[in-house]
């Protein structure tokens, strides 16, 4: 009986640790784009730094190149302009 209880406790802790690890990995991924995706967007940004507003065609091409959703592309540019662009 004692061995069974010990085994159940170990299994319970093991399962809980797996759940915690998965949650941490999920949270870490949120908000960060993969490096190659970010570099594609940054390259477009640098090439169009005077007026960083992609056309619908530009956005469609970036969706194809990066695999991101259109909403993610739009949000990236909104955030990038807020953080890094000063229209002088």
UniProtKB/Swiss-Prot annotation:
The compartments listed are:
Nucleus
Matching entries from Gene3D superfamilies are given as: Homeodomain-like
Q: Which GO terms describe its biological process?
A: regulation of DNA-templated transcription
CDD domains, per database record: homeodomain (cd00086)
Please give the tissue specificity annotation from the record for this chain.
Expressed in all tissues examined. Highest expression in leaves.
Report the superkingdom from the record.
Answer: Eukaryota
Q: Which GO terms describe its molecular function?
A: DNA binding
**What InterPro entries does the annotation carry?**
ELK_dom (IPR005539), HD (IPR001356), Homeodomain-like_sf (IPR009057), KN_HD (IPR008422), TALE_homeobox (IPR050224)
Query: What SMART domains does UniProt report for this protein, alphabetically?
Result: ELK, HOX
**The ELK domain, residue ranges:** 4-24
Main site of residence? Answer: nucleus
Look up keyword Transmembrane helix and say if it applies: no
Q: Which residues bind DNA?
A: 25-88
| Cellular compartments per GO CC | nucleus
Family named by the database record: Belongs to the TALE/KNOX homeobox family.
- This one is known as Homeobox protein knotted-1-like 2
Q: Please name the source species.
A: Zea mays
- The UniProt gene name for this protein comes to KNOX2
